[in-house]
């Protein structure tokens, strides 16, 4: 959903690298090369960006305050 601000394992700040990571992928960098360019060398930090799924835009389409009609 929302990009984690810190790595769950080591605590390094990674939230500010998400947009740059996406830009590098759009520029035809390989995932590993993009992470190297960002300075992410630990496996735990690399995992945080590689496995993140950005679902926030899809979830904003649902209205949680809307009541469904039981009939």
UniProtKB/Swiss-Prot annotation:
It is found in: Nucleus. One of its GO terms (biological process) is DNA-templated transcription. SUPFAM superfamilies: RNA polymerase subunit RPB10. Gene3D superfamilies: Homeodomain-like (1.10.10.60). Zn(2+) binds at residues 7, 10, 44-45. InterPro entries: RNA_pol_su_RPB10, RNA_pol_suN_Zn-BS, RPABC5/Rpb10. Keywords: DNA-directed RNA polymerase, Metal-binding, Nucleus, Transcription, Zinc. It comes from the Eukaryota. One of its GO terms (molecular function) is zinc ion binding. One of its GO terms (cellular component) is RNA polymerase II, core complex. Interacts with IYO. Belongs to the archaeal Rpo10/eukaryotic RPB10 RNA polymerase subunit family. HAMAP family: RNApol_arch_Rpo10 (MF_00250). NCBIfam families: PRK04016.1. This is DNA-directed RNA polymerase subunit 10-like protein. The gene is NRPB10L.
